[in-house]
């Protein structure tokens, strides 16, 4: 049986995320001569997970520059932003309607690059300049028109590269007549060309677009609200084109294939899976990540599938309004018996776990920062949907969020340790069942149980002379594989912050393992154990810190 290593003591951790109390464990341990090698300092092997903001309050480069300090206070790693240049007459020119036959000049957008270079980014590391497939009135066989479209894409990549931003954000959705860019049925010239002819031409145009893009920015990231995920219903067919011919985005897979034909290894593409707006379960995010990674390869030419697997990321969109809209709205996320803000936290967490790197947060009716858009309410999202900002902060980085909340509570004098004998300073303590437990000479500290494998001859004891901040520690000497244990009642959905301070001696190693039992004291949810290592520093006393969410069916945290 795996070692039931202890989570350590608890403090009440009140936050806007949920009504249940969350818990904070904290303890001091001294481990000596455990038979496990100490590990050298290493690089951070975690996959980066990032939240990108977008919506009706989207900033242009000027507002981004003017409001960056305020914007970076929000729980995001970057934004999709608009580029608005000025033509020779001084009139504004939007970069976003890129699929038009209008000729633009680079110098019209030099102000956007100047804005971005003058913006003092500290937190927003991943920012993307937005373009879209509108007005979409350039026929795929219009060579002159597509020269303009290709040049618009080139300008977007140029702006991104010259400003030091991450790349281009592409919205394929048609918002203006003729709503035609990727729909074969909407093509004005479909009477002259078959679907297969349009499909081949769309791939050629994709090649031209991406060749221009990577000439400007070889290491670009092209982040789409959706890619082949929008056509998942066409998979599972011998020839997906039989389905795509009727799809509103039936030509999009060919356009993407063209991208892949010419993309260098350093280019990255992100399928944002806008379909996720309705998702309300971990299963949906995992299933659609598999769809994007596996099934959607059927929409990619065989010669491009290895490149697709290597360079196309799975991402998800989270629609904030769905957690704010009334139940009568078709865009409504149910709380499933709890608060809708709690569902926002859970769903955003699931989205980040299933995504390769990015999740985009989209809002319409409320705002995160100043906007001139009259269709957006004056209220911020934290005002309109209390707890929403904390929900996103927790999902993005539970440890950072927990540390901040604990610091707030400590400053307010309301941080209470719920662990029993957490500082190892007492020889008497009330147990989990309410029965007093007295320390026994030569034994572990009062209130703590111990375990070690049968062939280990180590000693667990109470050391009254050492401690991280005061005298008192639990000591394990020559324990080959064992742990201190404490059990507490827990409820599904609770959030537990776990902290220990450890001193290692000799060739010892230690970690905290959080395990789960049913209310009947049976082990459960083994796959959701949480293991927290000791931080790699040169300090004498080193910290273990992490967060564990109580899974369904759990009644006790161990």
Question: Where in this protein do the model-derived segments appear?
Answer:
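N-terminal secretory signal peptides that target proteins for export/translocation
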Residues: 1-20
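Extracellular and organelle-lumenal recognition/adhesion modules and their flexible linkers in secreted
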Residues: 410-558
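Coiled-coil-like amphipathic alpha-helices with heptad-repeat character
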Residues: 6-7, 41, 446, 459
């Amino acid at each position: 049986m795996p070692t039931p290593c202890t989570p350590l003591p608890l403090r009440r951790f009140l936050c806007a995320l949920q009504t249940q109390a969350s818990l904070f464990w904290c303890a001091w341990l001294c481990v000596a001569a455990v038979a496990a090698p100490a590990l050298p300092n290493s690089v951070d092997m975690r996959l980066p997970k990032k939240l990108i903001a977008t919506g009706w309050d989207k900033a242009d480069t000027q507002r981004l520059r003017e409001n960056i300090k305020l914007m970076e206070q929000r729980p995001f790693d970057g934004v999709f932003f608009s580029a608005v240049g000025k033509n020779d007459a001084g009139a504004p020119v939007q970069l976003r309607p890129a699929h038009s036959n209008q000729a633009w000049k680079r110098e019209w957008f030099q102000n956007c690059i100047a804005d971005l270079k003058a913006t003092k980014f500290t937190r927003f590391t991943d920012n993307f300049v937005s373009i879209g497939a509108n007005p979409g009135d350039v026929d795929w066989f219009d060579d002159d028109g597509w020269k303009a479209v290709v040049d618009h894409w080139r300008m977007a990549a140029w702006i991104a590269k010259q400003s030091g931003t991450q790349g281009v954000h592409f919205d394929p959705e048609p918002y203006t007549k003729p709503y035609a860019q990727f729909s074969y049925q909407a093509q004005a010239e479909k009477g002259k060309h078959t679907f297969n002819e349009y499909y081949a031409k769309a791939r050629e145009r994709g090649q031209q677009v991406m060749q221009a893009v990577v000439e400007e920015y070889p290491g670009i990231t092209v982040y789409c609200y959706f890619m082949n995920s929008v056509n998942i219903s066409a998979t599972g067919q011998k020839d997906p084109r039989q389905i795509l011919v009727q799809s509103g985005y039936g030509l999009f897979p060919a356009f993407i294939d063209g991208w892949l034909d010419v993309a260098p290894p350093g280019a990255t593409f992100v399928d944002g899976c806008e379909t996720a707006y309705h998702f309300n379960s971990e299963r949906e995010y995992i299933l659609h990540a598999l769809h994007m990674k596996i099934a959607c390869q059927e929409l990619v030419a065989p010669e491009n599938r290895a490149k697709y697997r290597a360079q196309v990321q799975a991402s998800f969109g989270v629609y904030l309004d769905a957690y704010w809209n009334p139940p009568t709205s078709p865009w409504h996320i149910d709380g499933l018996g709890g608060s809708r803000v709690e569902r926002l936290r859970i769903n955003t967490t699931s989205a980040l776990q299933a995504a390769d790197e990015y999740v985009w947060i989209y809002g319409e009716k409320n705002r995160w920062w100043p906007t001139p858009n009259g269709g957006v309410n004056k209220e911020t999202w934290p005002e309109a949907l209390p707890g929403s900002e904390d929900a996103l902060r927790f999902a993005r980085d539970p440890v950072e969020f927990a540390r901040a909340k604990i610091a707030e509570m400590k400053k307010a004098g309301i941080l209470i340790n719920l662990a029993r004998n957490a500082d190892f300073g007492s020889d008497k303590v009330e147990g989990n069942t309410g029965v007093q437990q007295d320390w026994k000479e030569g034994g572990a500290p009062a209130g703590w149980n111990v375990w070690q494998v049968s062939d280990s001859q180590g000693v667990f004891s109470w050391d009254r002379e050492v401690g991280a901040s005061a005298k008192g520690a639990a000591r394990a000497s020559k324990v080959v594989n064992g742990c201190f244990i404490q059990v507490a009642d827990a409820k599904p959905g609770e959030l537990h912050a776990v902290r220990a301070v450890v001193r290692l001696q000799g060739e010892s190693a230690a970690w905290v393992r959080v395990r789960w039992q049913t209310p009947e004291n049976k082990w459960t949810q083994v796959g959701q154990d949480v293991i927290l290592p000791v931080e790699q520093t040169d300090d004498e006393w080193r910290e273990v810190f992490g967060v564990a969410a109580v899974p369904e069916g759990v009644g006790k945290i161990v």
